[in-house]
Amino acid sequence: MGHIRQSYLENTLDNEKRKKLIKVISHDVERIERLITDYSQMLKDEATLSRAKMKKIDLLNVINTVVEDFNSDLLNSNKNIKINISNSNLNGSKVNVWGVESKLEQILANLLDNAVSFSPSDSKISVMCNIKKKDAQLIIEDQGPGFNEKNIDKVFNRFYSNRPEKFGEHSGLGLNIVKNIIELHGGSIIASNQSGNKKGARIEVLLPLYN
């Protein structure tokens, strides 16, 4: 079918129009493929977590591992973004949560990937870990444009995307997948913009502590 369509385009349109139309079609195909991939991953995550046995996970170890990987990759990029970890309020305390380690890594990786994609060059992303009552609190702040205040309550909706074209294509499933995984861990996630003179997005994740 694809060959027939391409042959039709080649025989009915002039060269310039044909190139533009093929580019549009290719772009749409890539978007649909990305959507299918993300949706399939979401279903896989839900199925995996429904079967998985949760155990005690050292959240600080997860954070250190994921951030180290990201900083290593960012060294080879041209954006010059640095991810900093702050857990000074813990005074050396361990932060253990109930969870599936690979999925906790996925949560942080997805959130950092989102933060990096919106961050300008020569900026910093902060990852903070604290204990808030009976939960582990994970906060990620970037120095990007932040969320659109009018639609901030929709950012975790399935297929919702308000990403400007300059920040690249997006399926609208990334944050929804993260939210699903967090809720399957018994946690919650909140999106907001930083307050005061600070500019950028703020994500707060709460996960039940292991007792």
Language-model region placement:
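Short conserved segments within the C-terminal catalytic ATPase subdomain
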Residues: 73-88
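Short helix-loop "hinge" at the ATP-lid/N-box region of the Bergerat-fold HATPase_c
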Residues: 115-116
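Conserved micro-motifs of the catalytic ATP-binding
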Residues: 13, 47-52, 92-99
